[in-house]
């Protein structure tokens, strides 16, 4: 992969990481990185093995896991804090990624049994 394309993908990944709780517009990210949407999708997947949307989702869920482990907040609050508009959608995606519902996982994380 050419250096300039690699730099553009790094820039896109950094933008998504920094703004993970915001609504993601791949079109806007592509424009800011001076790429077409299709080129961004294609090259982003080569570099990260995820689409830009899946990358954002992974970051959101990891951040939610950290919030649930370290703060005394409920699942719905964690969902909204990381950018989800629906607590039920958040719970489904969280369980899919971590293998258990966020409420159960947060209790385990807070008790120090799992990391």
Residue ranges and their predicted role:
Residues 20-21, 68-70:
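Short amphipathic helical patch at the helix-1/turn junction of helix-turn-helix
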Residues 48, 71, 76:
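Ser/Thr-centric signal marking residues that sit
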Residues 77, 81, 112-115:
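Intrinsically disordered, low-complexity basic tails/linkers immediately adjacent to helix-turn-helix/homeobox/MYB/SANT
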Residues 1-14, 18-22, 110-115:
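Inter-domain helical "communication" segments and dimerization helices
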Residues 11, 15-17, 23-59, 79-104:
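Basic/polar phosphate-binding segments, predominantly the helix-turn-helix DNA-binding elements
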Residues 56-65, 104-115:
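Short, basic, alpha-helical segments at the C-terminal edge of helix-turn-helix-like DNA-binding modules
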